[in-house]
Amino acid sequence: MKRIVNFIWILLCTVVVHASGSGDGRQVENFDFGWRFSLDPHLNERKAMKQSFDDEGWKYLNLPHDWAVEGYFSEKYPSGPGGGALPGGVGWYRKHFKIDKKDAGKRIYIHFDGAYMNTSVYFNGKKIGWRPYGYIPFEYELTSLVNFDGDNVILVKVDNSDQPNSRWYSGCGIYRNVYLIKTGGVHVVTDGTYIKTTSLTDKAAELEVVTTLCNKTGKQETVEVKSILKDRDGNVVDEAESRPIIAPTTDSNTDIVHTLDVANPHLWNLDDTYMYTLFTEIKIDGFLVDSYETPYGIRNIKFTADKGFFLNGKNMKINGVCLHHDLGCLGAAINNVALHRQLKMLKDMGCNGIRCTHNPPAPELLNMCDTMGFVVMDEAFDMWRRRKTANDYARFFDKWHEVDLKDMVRRDRNHPCIVMWSIGNEVLEQWNSANADTLSLAMANLVLNFGHNEKQEIESGKKNMNTLLTEHLIKIVKDLDQTRPVTAGCNEPSPANNLFKAEGLDIIGYNYHNKNIPDVPKNFPGKPFIITESVSALATRGYYRMPSDSMFIWPKRWDIPFEDATFSCSSYDNCHVPWGSTHEETLDVVKNNDFVAGQFLWTGFDYIGEPTPFGWPARSSFFGVVDLAGFPKDAYYLYQSEWSDKPVLHLFPHWTWDEGDEIDMWCYYNNADEVELFVNGESRGVRKKTEHCYHAVWNKVFYRPGSVKVVARKNGAIVGTKEIFTAGKPRSIRLTADKTVQKADRRDLTYITVEILDQQGHLCPDATDLVRFVISQGNAKIIGVDNGSPISSERFKIDCRRAFYGKCLVVVQNNGDAGKIKLTASSGVLTPASVEIDVIR
């Protein structure tokens, strides 16, 4: 119950992390509702920015919004299957709003958590800003242009027409939250509070608080700055106060430093995510002009070369996954409920780490990792100067990388969940080439301002421009945060890698290359090591290719086109890419090498785009241990059996085949010494896991209709059984809602699992029936359907879905009205089913 309370508390703080308070203090208003939208590459922006422009014909919607996921799949889109085979384009968002005259003395800002990409913002007829990077927050001041008590119009142009620009599905639009901020003339700048633990023992902690203020009053002001630290129960732990004289802000802001003491600190850890809250108050002449809240967890992290990762002095493995930002059938549009569903499934699997691949995440993800107990690798870029796709961020890197990297670190550095920064993923600057890009003159002056000795090192081959660029990025991070190590995801394991030669890269990070891992202590003496990206096994939920001890390495090479008539990958953990491994192989490497701090498995969930090893009609990935709809694949239970203490007894595959088939039966289990298989009551033998094998297997089990059962024993006593029955023909539909109560907020969701059953109530594992959905009662909408198939061309935003290996999914959202929602599912002659949801205020 404590964990749930923590989670709810931190979600409330997501609105006030930037600040709290109303009236005389800061006001932060959610600005997501009541927008109009048009997808039009030919719109005249000079006309659209005018207040008199007629937008009545535009679509009415609320943010966050991803227009691409609403479209049809097509191989003709320039994004290609790698980008999800969904449309790009130019989208326009427009909103009318009023600001009261009582706010005339305040500073007014508009804050975007993220929009993909090339976002231009216009306010009351004037362009006020442009931001190219699609994953970074940005903010503009509106004050001088506001019509107080009159009509105000904001217009946002999001241009994702230059495709391809991403190796995976990016989404399109204002896909993260937007806020309107009102504060005093002297105020804390956005992300302007930095807390760091300067000393920590069992009995005491010392915190340094740096508060960055700006003064936009136009005159010198004497201000009272107060920092108040409170515990979870609201008790004051310590406070500090100062009265600086703040000059009007021109080019620089003013930093105020306070020291706070915490007696007997309650430490943040993965099982007890205790958070303090720092309250910052700014007063002038006794009047509150700004207030600001910052949640903070006190903890100690350490990485060592011989033992890996320590949290609060406890050695532990980082059992992590890589996670892209899309939410399946919801696309890239952030939703707290959908994101929490993903993280809860991973937590239940035993996962304790998230790598944000390969970009700054939504702030909601970090808030949830703080409260749910994950450690995080926060990553800035997928490319630097050398591009990976025709129109990616490389074209903006020279001008924008420093701004974007600083904004990421400033925003995220107070999160206890973050234990390392990553400055890049598989950047091409790891290697030299005769055709290597040269730095711009401005960048050369910035990065290559070296003395005689460094120049000699370059000439002798010890350093080069890419090495110095790496050091430049590291310095940007460490100038803003000295409490966490810096790493990068590298797919070149050689010490000659330009990034590894750089000074200041604290942790060696390999993407894959298991065979090179034993040499890490020799090649990088004294350096901690982590597998920043691992495995890349391939699987289609419900599909099995035998014999299971055969290995399918697909494709033969990443740049060679590959085809297989099934467009499916075996779920036996016997299919992986040539640069990757099986799940069990990497589990074994991490488990049996103390110096390996852990791994980030590629990936936790399937994601839209990058459908390796296939091309069209495949349009989403095969890498996840959970499919795109949120249904676990078999490998999920392998990790749960190794990473968690939850009892696991998972037998697969199903038991509905052609008579006479010979089937390989696998079992993942824990908390048992042995497992025994029975077919129609007859034993097929006892099996045990071995030192380097993490499953039990019975090869070529002769199939006969009936049932297959596994019995687990510990010390001779039965501790678990699992039985699978042969399924008959489809007869009915079963609906299972993940919750039957929603909050009437127009955001809450219910995920409903749809299963096709036979007459006895057994899942039909090969069923492909088309299921239709209707809201038969209540004010709600279907906001997504899916079935986990990476090759389905069915749209996500319709009211029907074909079952895939017996299952599909429908997601229901309320429209803000309290009452009862009823969803009914039907399919031809199958017995229909309904589920009811109560919507409460």
How would you name each of these model-derived features?
Residues F303, S644-D664, N670-A672, F725-Y751, ...:
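Short S/T/G/P-enriched beta-strand
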Residues V209-L213, F279-E281, M665-Y669, V711, ...:
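Beta-strand-rich structural segments
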Residues N147, T212-T304, W698, R704-P705, ...:
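Extended acidic/polar, glycine-enriched regions
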Residues S20-H111, S166, G171-I174, F605, ...:
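Extended carbohydrate-recognition surfaces in non-catalytic/accessory domains of CAZymes
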Residues Y60-D66, E70-F73, N177, F287-T690, ...:
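Extended substrate-binding grooves/exosites of carbohydrate-active enzymes
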Residues S52, E221-K226, E239, L270-Y276, ...:
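Short flexible loop/turn segments that cap and initiate beta-strands
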Residues L142-S144, V257-L267, V697-Y703, K797-G816:
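Short, hydrophobic beta-strand segments
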Residues F33, S38-D40, G83, G88-D191, ...:
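Accessory beta-strand-rich segments of carbohydrate-active enzymes
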